[in-house]
Amino acid sequence: MTMAAKTDREALQAALPPLSGSLSIPGLSAPVRVQRDGWGIPHIKASGEADAYRALGFVHAQDRLFQMELTRRKALGRAAEWLGAEAAEADILVRRLGMEKVCRRDFEALGAEAKDMLRAYVAGVNAFLASGAPLPIEYGLLGAEPEPWEPWHSIAVMRRLGLLMGSVWFKLWRMLALPVVGAANALKLRYDDGGQDLLCIPPGVEAERLEADLAALRPAVDALLKAMGGDASDAAGGGSNNWAVAPGRTATGRPILAGDPHRVFEIPGMYAQHHLACDRFDMIGLTVPGVPGFPHFAHNGKVAYCVTHAFMDIHDLYLEQFAEDGRTARFGNEFEPVAWRRDRIAVRGGADREFDIVETRHGPVIAGDPLEGAALTLRSVQFAETDLSFDCLTRMPGASTVAQLYDATRGWGLIDHNLVAGDVAGSIGHLVRARVPSRPRENGWLPVPGWSGEHEWRGWIPHEAMPRVIDPPGGLIVTANNRVVADDHPDYLCTDCHPPYRAERIMERLVASPAFAVDDAAAIHADTLSPHVGLLRARLEALGIQGSLPAEELRQTLIAWDGRMDAGSQAASAYNAFRRALTRLVTARSGLEQAIAHPFAAVPPGVSPQGQVWWAVPTLLRNDDAGMLKGWSWDEALSEALSVATQNLTGRGWGEEHRPRFTHPLSAQFPAWAALLNPVSRPIGGDGDTVLANGLVPSAGPEATYGALSRYVFDVGNWDNSRWVVFHGASGHPASPHYADQNAPWSDCAMVPMLYSWDRIAAEAVTSQELVPA
C-alpha cells in the first residue's frame, strides 16, 4: 500500500460516525435505542412517535448524509454546485419545474400530523449536523459544509426520486419517431404492443400540421433529453416485480408477498433498510434517506405491502403557440399572458448559468423557445396540483388490514404504483395507488395542441374507480409494470407500459407451485429464462444454413441454447450480441437512428432509437412484420445480424460481460479516489426481459445498468422468517464494512434475515447506541 493510499484509507475511516455509546439529542422526550444487526441494519425503538421520527432523521444522517444532501440538491436545482457542468442542464430543468415552490405549497397544505412528522424528522437530521460527529468523506473532497434541513425538503427528495417517471419520455420519443416512420409504424414502437387505438391519433390534416410543428422542436427536445441523462433512463428503463400468494396456495397457510424494485444502479442506492418502532407502530422496511416513513415496502406486524410502477399516464405535454414577443400564448381565439422570470444556477468549476422560466396555463416550458413561436409545456400530476402523499404516510402505519391500508392511501399522487398487500387475517390485494387526471385518451400519444381547449384536464378519476382487487379468485396477484387495464377501459389511465414477459413468467411459476414457500421466492427472483427463446429457435431453424462458417456456428449455438440468461452461459452472451446486432440493423434500416442524432442515444429504453427498437423487435419478428426493414425480409435481416454479431463474440460467460459498474457520484471528479469510492461488483445473469431483470443499454454494450435495488419476501404473520437484501449495503460510508457487504448475497440472488422480534434483535445486535434527551 502506498503512503497516499494509506492516507486516503485513514481519511475514510476517520469519516465514520460513532455507532455505540450514548449521544444527547435535543428535543427527545425519552431515550431511544438504536441497535444494528450483523448487516449494519438499524433497528430503532422509541417511546413516542415524534421521538421515533426524530431518531430516524438522526440515523439516516449517520449513515447516508451525503446521499441525502446530493438528492436534495438535485431536487432543488443545485447539484451543479457540487458536480459541475454535467449537472447544469438537469438543474435548469428542475428549476423550470418549480420544485421549491410546489414543495413549499404541499407542506403548507398537509395536515397537522404530517407536518409534525416532517418537523421531527428534519430536527433529527439537524441534530446530527450539530452533534460534532465526523462528516462523510465527500464533504472533505468537495470542501463543502452540510446545510440545515427544513421540513419541505423531504417532500423535494421524495418528488425527485420519481421525477417525471413514465409517460413523458414515451410521448417525446413518439414525437421524434413519427416524422421518420409515420403513425402506423410509430404505434409498433410501444413497449408492450398494447392495442390499436393509437393508429388514428392525431387524425387527418391536424396530424400533418402538428407533425411539422413538432419536428421544428426536435433540437430542443434533444437538448431536454440530454439534460436528464440517466434520470430519463431510470424513468423509462426501470421497473419492478411483485406478487402475493393467498393462504390457500402457500405451504404456511398464511399470505406470502415478494418482489424487487428495479432502478438504475446509483451509489448509494435509493433505499435503506430500517426498523422503526414506537407506542403507535412497529414497522420494518425500505426507507428513502431524506424522507420519514415507509412509502413503498414495509410491514407493521399486521399488514405488509410492496409496490411496482403502474405506468399510469400522469404527465401531459402541450405544444404552445406564442406571440412574437413570447409574452403571450394562444388559447382558443385569444392570446393569454404567460409568466416569465429569470433564474441563475452556480456551476462548480465554471461560470454561473442564467436562463428564463416561462409558464403558460398548462405549466412550464421544458423545451423550445417562446421567442421562436412554439415550445413544449408540461402539465404533470407531480407538480400541477397540491399533493398530500405525506398525509398518507402518517395513516399507513395504523392500518391493520389490506382494506384499511388502501383507504389510508387515498390522495397519494407523487408517483403511481401497483400497491400489493397481505394481512395477518389472510387477505391479499392489489390497488393502483395514483392520482390520474380525467382527460381525452388522445393525450397519451403525443404532445397535444395547447391552444385548442380539447385536451384540458377535467378533474380526477376517483380513488374508488382505480383498479383494485382484494382476495381474487385463484389466490394469486402478480404485477411487473405490465398493463393493468385494456386500451378500451372506461377511464383513460395509460398508453405505455412494459411487456408482459416478467408477469407471465412469475404467474407461470406460481401456478406450478400449489404450496408456495418462502424459499421459493428466491428461485423466482433468480429466474433467467428469456421469453424469446422459442421464437428465436423457430426462426433460426427455418432460416437454413448460413454462407459463412462463423455465422452458421452462431446460428447453431443459438438454436441449441436453453434460453437462460445465466451468468455462466456463453450462449447467453452470443444471444445478446445477436440481438444487439439485429436491433442496430432495424434501427438503421427504418431510419430511426436519425431520430435522435447525438450521444444521448445511449440512454436506456424510452428515449433512444435502439432502446425502443430493442423492445419492439420480438413483436415485429413474431408478427413477421417487415414494414420498418425498407424492402428487406426478416430472413435477410436475421442473416445479416448473425454475420455482424460474429464480430462481437468474446467467448466469455454472460455474467462477466454483464457485470455492472457501480459508480460513486464523485469518482469521476476525484479519480484518485475512485477505487475506494466505487463498490466492487460481481458477475450477474438476467436481462431486461427476464424476471431477474438486470437490464442494459442496447446501444452502449452488455453491461448491466439497472436492476433490483432490493429483493424481499414477507412471510405474513411469521415476520422473523421474512428476508431481504440490497445491492450494496446499509451504509453510505465507503469505509464502512456495510458499504457493500450485501452485494455478494445479492449477486447470488440470496437474501439476509429481516429481523423483527426485539428479543432476537437484542441477541444478534452488533452495535447498540442510546440517544438521550439533551
Swiss-Prot record:
InterPro entries: Ntn_hydrolases_N (IPR029055), Pen/GL7ACA/AHL_acylase (IPR014395), Penicillin_amidase_A-knob (IPR043147), Penicillin_amidase_dom1 (IPR023343), Penicillin_amidase_N_B-knob (IPR043146), S45 (IPR002692). It comes from the Bacteria. It holds the Pfam family Penicil_amidase. Keywords: Antibiotic resistance, Hydrolase, Zymogen. Its EC number is 3.5.1.11. The active site is at S240 (nucleophile). One of its GO terms (biological process) is response to antibiotic. Coiled coil: none annotated. One of its GO terms (molecular function) is penicillin amidase activity. The keyword Membrane does not apply. It catalyses: a penicillin + H2O = 6-aminopenicillanate + a carboxylate. Belongs to the peptidase S45 family. Heterodimer of a small subunit and a large subunit processed from the same precursor. This is Penicillin acylase 2 proenzyme.
